[in-house]
Amino acid sequence: MASLKLTLGVFAIALVGVWVPAPASAQNSPYVIAASDAASALPGATVTANDVDESITTIKKRVDEVNVLFIATDRHGKFVRNLNQTDFSIFDDHKPVESILNFRRETDLPIELGLLMDVSGSVQGRFGFEKDAATGFLQHIIRPGYDRAFVVGFNKESRVTQDFTDKMPLLAAGVQRLNNGGGTALYDAIYKACKDKLLHDQFDHPVRKAIVILSDGEDNQSETTRAQAIEMAQRAEVLIYAISTDDSGLILRGDKVLEDLASATGGRAFFPYKMKDITRSFAAIEDELRSQYDVAYKPSGFDADGRYHSIEITALKKDLQVRARRGYYAPRQ
């Protein structure tokens, strides 16, 4: 198979500071149901982030350095964990980058995670099981003293039921306080979570930021557009993972929305049909968050123009697939 070329993306921000190696991984106890292979993702449409809020503040550190986390898999979908810097090339706005400044595998980087659960009336069928599975996921992935998470329930409005914490009893209580009913403002929830919780430069060490969404993807209340939600996630360097709550077995409009949100930010969407597949989806997300690579590079002829820039990563190994963000927004000076 010819080498694969994917258009990906990152937000222009350097991960700087001293990283202290993590303690041993959290307990290996299973979730509600033992984890196995994740459900397959659906192909999604591409959305261009235009006409967005120009008042958004871009985080600036070293302006000429771009940093991206990415996943590599083989043709069977299994993670490839032995890549070298010579196994891929990077293009920024279709031009070869000037230099690669850093490349390493990130397995224990601290996680800052947002759990966003759709509590609208359309998702009530499996809501109780989903809350239990989400609680199991948080218990398994959050390492006290190292990782943190927050919990948000959204219908026509978003409500934080538990702010950032590493304490599992508080997170579990935050999930159990969620009650469903009402319309759905998915894009507003993503935008607000990224802007209020994950955008600001509040971390004094490298972290990986992610949002896990449980929803059917049907938005009927948001003032924010999908493009604006995607841009805010890209500016905040947030990976979006989505687990569909639709159990019809059909490919619906909401499924394509979830796929697009995930692929635009370097995450992944899952479409579990059976309840046990929800648990498997959570397990796959955890595995992926522990199987990423981090590369930092200097673009050729970098210009702090505030524009959106695309990234292309060309895998040089046969049958290798790479997944990351579609693009980033340069700082403006």
Where are these regions (language model features)?
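Positively charged n-region of N-terminal signal peptides that target proteins for export
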Residues: 1-6
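Bacterial N-terminal signal peptides
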Residues: 9-19
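Sec/Tat signal peptide C-region and signal peptidase I cleavage site
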Residues: 19-26
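Scaffold/interface architecture of coatomer-like assemblies
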Residues: 26-333
